[in-house]
C-alpha cells in the first residue's frame, strides 16, 4: 500500500521512462509510420536507430535510418534511389505521464534541427 501511495506522488522522469521503453516505442513508431502510406509508392521494410534521443518539454525526437522498397504499382520499381536508406527523425509525445507516438517521421532534417524547431514552438517563438 505504501509503495502504491509513493508512486502517486513521485515526480516523473520522462527521459528515464523513454529510455526504459525505447525499443518498444521505436517499434510502435515504425509500425505507425509504415502504415501511413507515406512516402507514396514506397513500403517501409526496416529501420536502424541513430544516436541518442533528444528531449524537450513534452516531446522527444530520435534519428533513424529507414529502408524502403518500391510498391509493385507505385511507379518507382525502376528508380534505384527508391531502395536507398533514408535518414528520418522519429517524433514522440509525453502526455499524462505516458510516452506515445503518432508515427510522425520528419525527412530532410537532423534530430538536432527538429529539436530546435520543437523548442521554438514550445517557447512561442
Range-by-range predicted roles:
Residues 83-85, 101-125:
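Low-complexity, intrinsically disordered terminal/linker segments enriched in charged
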Residues 33, 48, 76-78, 85, ...:
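Residue-level detector of functional hotspots within protein domains
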Residues 5-9, 82, 110:
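Residue-level signal for functionally critical sites in structured catalytic/ligand-binding pockets
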Residues 66-95:
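Exposed beta-sheet edge and beta->alpha loop/turn motif
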Residues 2-61, 69:
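N-terminal topogenic membrane-targeting module
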